[in-house]
Structures are given as C-alpha cells and as structure tokens.
C-alpha cells in the first residue's frame, strides 16, 4: 500500500510541477475569466498578473473605435426602408424580365451545341435523333416553367 501511495504522490507532484512550469500562452489550465482576458488582449496574456501601469499600455486603443452609431446622414429613415425593401425583393427574385429575354437565344445556342457534340460522339443516327428530341422536350419544359414563374 505504501508503494502505491508513493507512486500516486509522485504523479500528483509531477502534475503540479508541469502545470506551474507550463508555457504562458497555454490555454489548458487557465480559468474562464483569464481566458476571456487573454482573448481580448492582443498579446494573449492575462492582464490581472501584470501591474496596472503596464496593463494600461497593453490594452487596445478604444478611442479609435466607433461607439456612437447615430451618425448623421442625408438619407432619411423612410428612404432607407424603401431601399432595403427594394433590395430584398430584387435579391429574392434574382432576375428581371429584361435579363430573361436576353437569355432566350442562349437556349437555342445550347441546343445547337448539344446536337454537334452528339453528332461527334453518338454514331447511331436513331439514338442521336432520340437524344436530340429528348433534350428538345426538356428545353421546352424548362422554358414553360420559367415563363409561368415569371407571370
């Protein structure tokens, strides 16, 4: 029994020694208050262990930070609300009717490109025609859904 106690005491002493000699930036043995102070402090050290005069030098300069949010502006609150509402509507929609009309020729260009690719890689004419018809029907369905969504 005495040998076991001796081993446990040695283990406890080595743990205490390693905790007291650990690196100053180690976060494994720091209390929560010290950890928050270390996070706030740019050097990562606990300010409570430093003399007051030196701690004042280490604190970040808060005079440059903007604390007052009441900055005067020429834009009124109602104009800001209108702009925010318009922004929400346009961003949720993501497009305009004018931008959609300019993209219709792209669909036909994609169709022609797919026909060319199929002509190069699909050598059976019947299979190629079936794939072209399927892709054409798919494009018609997509266009129908887009037009119904716009209305």
From Swiss-Prot:
GO terms for cellular component: mitochondrial inner membrane; mitochondrion; respiratory chain complex II (succinate dehydrogenase). Heme binds at residue 109. Expressed in flowers, inflorescences and stems. Residues 1-78 form a transit peptide. A ubiquinone binds at residue 121. Keywords: Electron transport, Heme, Iron, Membrane, Metal-binding, Mitochondrion, Mitochondrion inner membrane, Transit peptide, Transmembrane, Transmembrane helix, Transport, Tricarboxylic acid cycle. It is a single-pass membrane protein. This is Succinate dehydrogenase subunit 4, mitochondrial.
